[in-house]
């Protein structure tokens, strides 16, 4: 693939399945070259994109590990010649209602959830920033987990008890969005955040769940808007999507 053919290049973390996979396919369908990074096998996602005529490569990487994140970014630039967009989607939310309360929670469990959801965003961003600032038009979109703030959380998981590490990590992602924007805006990097507050049915979930809830495709028009909007309009802000409207979250506006 000739590097001169590439116009926009995106690195999507946590892109092997779910929301990340949908993001990768959506961006590739619009002519972008995408690098899909995930701890999971990315081959199925890459084959899907290439089958539709898109440009894509995959890398198995723990994006909370600095060396692995740096390698993923380096492979992106080596393959496509540049890096314009980082989508921080990597994360983990153990399923079920059996999470322990904080007084009983093992510190290792807390650290594992925070590492997957918040540390990965920090580490991936640090690895990508030098290349994004080279473009002076770089974009970072952080995907926050909206469930704990949305009305469907209780009906799905019972309540927020026991969800401390996940909720703290995702709130941290939103605050980090503001911090990164303030630190990097003079280098031309726009940093923003998307928080879905509705239940999103993912491609690996049971059929009955996918029949009841919208898929990640419902988020894509809003993600594309965040990638194209004036940086002064979206930079440092988190936007929540409630299934009908996209609106700025007041405490980050």
Regions found by a protein language model. Give the residues of each.
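Catalytic loop of short-chain dehydrogenase/reductase
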Residues: 93, 141-172, 177-178, 182-185, ...
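Substrate-binding pocket helix/loop in short-chain dehydrogenase/reductase
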Residues: 97-102, 106-111
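C-terminal helical subdomain
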Residues: 186, 193-194, 209-253
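Active-site loop of short-chain dehydrogenase/reductase
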Residues: 7-8, 54-55, 82-83, 97, ...
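The beta1-alpha1 cofactor-binding region of Rossmann-like NAD(H)/NADP(H)-dependent oxidoreductases
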Residues: 60-72, 107
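Canonical Rossmann dinucleotide-binding motif of NAD(H)/NADP(H)-dependent dehydrogenases/reductases
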Residues: 3-35
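A short, exposed helix-loop element centered on a Lys and neighboring polar residues
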Residues: 125-126, 178
